[in-house]
Regions:
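Boundary detector for helix-to-coil junctions that initiate low-complexity/charged tails
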Residues: 1-90
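Metal-ion/cofactor- or nucleotide/acyl-coenzyme-handling active-site neighborhoods
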Residues: 73-320
Length: 320
């Protein structure tokens, strides 16, 4: 009898354990479903943009045969890049779901203070392309630079964005000391690529604000206080998203050359040719996405390309 009762008690305990496990599974499922519902409500434009960006990339890659002789791309290169695109999309979706609270917490502590900060003013977003050498600073404009643009002797930047530690190691310490108290730095954290993100010790040394950005494709959205900053293989898009937050009347694009000609300081781009052309293709898609985004959500902000090369004809062009 005792053995029978023991078996009954053991069975009861097992049933409770199973029930608890089922409850835990249901709780996880409920959490995932709620996260997906929140994303569906809050990020429809982002996911539609991601899908359009990837489809656009696929279309462009399928039409690439006519360009193969010029840039020496092979079918294997194209297939590899398409696989990389699919993997990046899945990785970004994962990080967006499971790091959403971290993104919101950080961005809500950083960006609200800058909303409408430069309303009605002119902003120059400064890249590092060769045409930066020709730029004559626009009087009275707020200057937002990226990467090593701060090394241009004629510039006095008000803001500086850096997010790729691999390419910035050679000048990050100089950036930390640049115009201290006058130029606010923003050092990015790349979700899924922490090994190339700016280390915390450098951000502390620069008194820099942190922000999150995704790898590769990450479209623009109006609410950067709750979402990652955009990225199309260029930090310029993060700087542009910040510029939009401040509500200027006009944004000048300086040194945003979007080609393989290297940098304003004479340094060349040492990427493999196939990878470079792939990166430029993503970058150009980003500019087209930005153009559509601006036309829909910020039609009152004028975008002007200064001494344009790769962006010629996309926005209003001026030459100095």
């Amino acid at each position: 009898m005792s053995s029978f009762i023991d078996r009954i008690l053991a069975t009861r305990i097992r049933v409770k354990q199973i029930a608890k496990s089922v409850d835990e599974v249901h709780a996880v499922q409920d959490r995932i479903e709620q996260l997906l519902k929140d994303m569906q409500q809050n990020l429809p434009h982002e996911f539609e943009s991601k899908a359009q960006a990837i489809q656009g990339k696929i279309d462009s890659q399928l039409q690439i045969d006519s360009q193969l002789q010029n840039v020496h791309l092979t079918k294997a290169d194209t297939q590899l890049h398409l696989l990389q695109m699919a993997r990046l999309f899945n990785d970004n979706l994962y990080h967006l779901i499971f790091h959403r609270e971290e993104i919101q917490t950080l961005h809500q502590s950083v960006f609200p203070q800058f909303a409408n900060q430069h309303e009605g003013r002119e902003i120059a977003v400064v890249g590092c392309g060769p045409t930066l050498k020709q730029y004559q600073p626009i009087p009275g404009a707020v200057h937002i630079g990226v990467n090593k643009s701060f090394q241009h002797p004629a510039l006095e930047l008000d803001y500086l964005f850096i997010q790729d530690y691999v390419s910035s190691k050679g000048y990050i310490e100089a950036a930390n000391q640049y115009r201290r108290g006058q130029c606010q730095k923003f050092y990015g954290i790349i979700l899924g690529a922490y090994e190339i993100s700016i280390p915390a010790i450098q951000a502390i040394a620069a008194n820099a604000y942190r922000y999150y950005v995704m790898v590769g494709y990450s479209p623009f959205c109006q609410d950067i206080q709750n979402n990652p900053l955009p990225n199309f293989n260029s930090i310029t898009f993060s700087a542009l998203a910040f510029a939009l937050l401040t509500k200027p009347k006009r944004i000048y694009l300086v040194g945003c050359d979007t080609n393989e000609s290297g940098y304003f300081d004479g340094q060349l781009n040492h990427m493999a040719q196939a990878d470079l052309m792939h990166s430029i293709s993503i970058n150009k898609q980003g500019w087209n996405h930005f153009k559509n985004f601006i036309d829909i959500f910020y039609p009152d902000i004028e975008i002007v390309s200064v001494n344009p090369v790769g962006l010629k004809g996309l926005f209003k062009d001026i030459y100095q």
